[in-house]
Amino acid sequence: MQFNDALDLCGKADNVYETVDTLVTKQKPDLIVITGDLVWAKFTKFSVIKAINKIDSYGIPWAPINGNHDGEGNVDLAWIANKYEEAENCLFKQGPDNIGGIGNYIINIRENDKIVQSLIMMDTHASRYYDKDDENMHYDFIFDSQIEWYKWAINGINEYNNSKTDSMIFMHIPIPEFKTAYDLWQQEGGAEGENFGIKGEEECPSYIIQVCSMQSRSLTVQNMYLPVMTI
């Protein structure tokens, strides 16, 4: 089960928690994934502790990644990361310190001794100036060091299994190819009877095209999961 975006807004998201309670009780997921912006508040410390305690209370493994708003309050991402790692049911790891971001980690789903699925959690950072002459900041992107780490990890998992292993990527800021794919899908009429929901705002991707360097037959990535459910 996947959630994202302002799960706790200024510590006052009781209606959101009620909705999450209902969904978790009904669906009984094996894993809860938070694809960024768990909190968005000036006083992040209070909101983070409240949100972590709530999600951890379900007794279900859960895996968060950072969004572009999590670190905007009165505590930084390193403090939040430590709190994630202290939570009993949270699978979050800060990840290697020699690549970009906090929270690049992998969840391997096993069947006996074989890894049958790898869930790749990646930090897409927040925002940056793309050029020294930029007047405005733009959404950030996955760094080259992260892509190399991803390739190294997947190749290692494939070697361990002695076969190609399916994998999925979870991230917060979308890559621009998602907007291209969505626009083409709309031009072709969508999928009547299958597509549903409300698109409440425009896409907010980075400007850096990266999917070709991250997706290949040898790496066997199946899907890239973005913040698609905002409640």
Where are the regions a protein language model picked out?
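N-terminal active-site segment of His-dependent metallophosphoesterases
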Residues: 1-51
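Active-site environment of divalent metal-dependent phosphoester hydrolases
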Residues: 2-5, 40-43, 64-76, 127-130, ...
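Divalent metal-coordination and catalytic microenvironments
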Residues: 20, 32, 37, 67, ...
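Short glycine/proline-enriched loop/turn "hinge" motifs that connect secondary-structure elements
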Residues: 24, 111-114, 185-186
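His/acidic metal-ligating clusters that form di-metal
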Residues: 27-30, 118-120, 133-231
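Extended active-site neighborhood of metal-dependent phosphoesterases/phosphodiesterases
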Residues: 49-163, 195
